[in-house]
């Protein structure tokens, strides 16, 4: 469950290390986002000479959360940290590599490019 002011790790090589959620997209009263949701983030920490700079505002897709993700078969999956992948306006990843596992739920949301770049899909 990601809400405004939540800090997330960045799971790609766009150059950002930490981002902060500044808006959950998908309705005016929507408060929280989960895996596969698109949020608006501000870059809080970035590598030097990278594609993105500190203070930049981008969209991001949540790929890992500490909060449980429930599957229809009753299984539960959770991670040690909250992580996101920065995407462009047309929801294409900014980076060319994805670090760490991502969840299968991204496939149903249409993020096939992220699924194909990820080293592991859980």
Swiss-Prot record:
Protein's recorded name: Large ribosomal subunit protein uL14
HAMAP family listed in its UniProt record: Ribosomal_uL14
Quaternary structure note: Part of the 50S ribosomal subunit. Forms a cluster with proteins L3 and L19. In the 70S ribosome, L14 and L19 interact and together make contacts with the 16S rRNA in bridges B5 and B8.
Record keywords: Ribonucleoprotein, Ribosomal protein, RNA-binding, rRNA-binding
Similarity annotation: Belongs to the universal ribosomal protein uL14 family.
Biological role stated in the UniProt entry: Binds to 23S rRNA. Forms part of two intersubunit bridges in the 70S ribosome.
GO MF assignments: large ribosomal subunit rRNA binding; structural constituent of ribosome
A Pfam family per the record: Ribosomal_L14
GO BP terms: translation
InterPro entries in alphabetical order: Ribosomal_uL14, Ribosomal_uL14_bac-type, Ribosomal_uL14_CS, Ribosomal_uL14_sf
SUPFAM superfamilies: Ribosomal protein L14
Database matches in CDD domains: Ribosomal_uL14 (cd00337)
GO cellular component: cytosolic large ribosomal subunit
């Amino acid at each position: 469950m990601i809400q405004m002011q939540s800090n997330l790790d960045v799971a790609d090589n766009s150059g950002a290390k930490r981002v902060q959620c500044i808006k959950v997209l998908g309705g005016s009263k929507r408060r929280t986002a989960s895996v596969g949701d698109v949020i608006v983030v501000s870059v809080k920490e970035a590598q030097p000479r990278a594609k993105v700079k500190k203070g930049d505002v981008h969209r991001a897709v949540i790929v890992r959360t500490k909060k449980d993700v429930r599957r229809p078969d009753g299984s539960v999956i959770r991670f040690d940290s909250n992580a996101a992948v920065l995407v462009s306006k047309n929801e294409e990843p900014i980076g060319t590599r994805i670090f760490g596992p991502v969840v299968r739920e991204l496939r149903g949301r249409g993020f096939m490019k992220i699924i194909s770049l990820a080293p592991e899909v859980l």
